[in-house]
Amino acid sequence: PAVAEEVRGVRENVGLMEITGFAKHEFSGTGARELLEKLLTNKIPKNGRIALAPMLNEAGKLIGDFTIASLTDQITEEEKFILFGSGIAEGYHQRCFLEHIDGNPTIRYRPLGNDMTGLSIAGPSSRDLLSSIASEDVSAESFRFLDIKNMSIGMIPSLVGRITFTGDLGYEIWVPSSLQSQLYELLTDVGKEFDMNLFGLRALDSMR
């Protein structure tokens, strides 16, 4: 019954879920794009875009299922990439990445761990909710499916991607861990106007 209520809330209005448990791997530096082109089966997306990114081993076996975001560092203006993937397999993937980097000093890799925390909103009212607190235009024309942008949510600097795995309209909002509680309080407060409810992994799995 609880899962059904969570699903109904997402399908009819908007739901909020924590996504910090996913692994976050950051790559930058000369050769980072080429390394990822080699490791992943998909074409690496253009700047400001997201793509699904499976990783295979030499035998063609699936060993990782990621979402990759192509970004520009706000300070250095350097190209960088973030791979979002399984939290359970985070250590295994770290070893794979380091093995392929093989000490290359021009490629910088770091697991972001809990330094980067995330919340996801999904459902037909998610755009209206986000639009009421975002510094950028998040209309369908300006913020397309699989776009990702830096913007302020309220006064909170955030990385926002238009992606969800619920089958509905939705967004992932990533912030430093020090700002997560502030973001949560903002979303839950504003979300009251949109009858927002919380949902968890069981509800998500039933909607995938």
Regions found by a protein language model. Give the residues of each.
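Glycine/proline-enriched, intrinsically flexible loops and inter-domain linkers
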Residues: 1-208
